[in-house]
Amino acid sequence: MSQPKVSKSSIFAIIAGVIVVLLVCMAGSLFEDADKSKNYVCQMPVTGEYVVWTDGGLKWQGGGNKYEYFKTSQIEFVDLTEVSEGNYVASGTNPAASLTFNDKGKGFIIGSFRVVMPNDDANMKKIQQDFGSEKALIANLIKPTLYKVVTSCGPLMSSLESVSETRTDLIAYITDQLNNGVYKTVVIRDSVTNEITGEKEMRAKAQIVADTNSPSGYKRQETSPFSQYGITCGLVSILDIKYDGATQSQIDAQKQANLAVITSKTKSLEAIQRTVQITEEGRAAAERAKWEQEKEKAVAVTK
């Protein structure tokens, strides 16, 4: 029994059908409708070359693997667990940033900052080659750099200063070091008055080394790793600083001591003002008495 012959048209139809099926299956990797809020790096098949897309619209993907990076994103460091009263541990996927102050107080900064990606091909290709994905970039570069920078800020202030006058400085320090590199510092020892005991004590404090040739006028231990990839950071926000139990107690005691000093000075000033007032009132009374005496003498003479 002879096999039925397959016509050329049938063969072409089968081939065309297979091609159509393949095209349908590959349609998602042939073209990409790029989102303008993202940068894309596409690794082309066979050659392995990178193609970067930084503007939106339909792009030829050619079956390559694409990797997406938001042009700007917010990085949070907010996760903190209180394991016991006044005892905190950084936890979760976005751990809070720890630091130790120059008075040996300890705390965790809870906050966020914004990362802006480069828009040029060279930097995006380098980022893709070195990290391979946005997730890896955040985990292996952005967050470790943040934690290193925050740690370097601790010795620049006391725990009490971080509560009050230098908290805005802390934001500036973090922003500057993220973009320009960690400060070069020297340790100086100053004789200071303990706010609680009133006694003199030696306290070590880190002082930033000035350098007019460096960014912001400060010498750097190293350049920021972000500068190697054209990444910039800004909008640093400190939502809260959680201090461990011992540090919080020390801060509260210092506040009470400062308040007591202010109260004492206020009372002393009030006493001085009262003394001045009494003196002035006495003078006024003496003047009135003298006037009355002169008045009586004048009346007696005219009689």
What are these regions (language model features)?
Residues 78-89:
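Flexible, solvent-exposed loop/hinge segments and secondary-structure transition points
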Residues 12-29:
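Hydrophobic membrane-insertion alpha-helices, especially the h-region
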Residues 37-46, 108-112:
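FKBP-type peptidyl-prolyl cis-trans isomerase
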Residues 88-303:
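Elongated, amphipathic alpha-helices that form coiled-coils and helical stalk/scaffold elements used
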Residues 24-40:
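Aromatic-capped interface at the extracytoplasmic side
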Residues 34, 41, 67-75, 113, ...:
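Generic structural hydrophobic/aromatic packing signal, biased to beta-strands
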Residues 42-79:
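Short extracytoplasmic
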Residues 1-10:
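N-terminal Lys/Arg-rich, disordered targeting/topogenic segments
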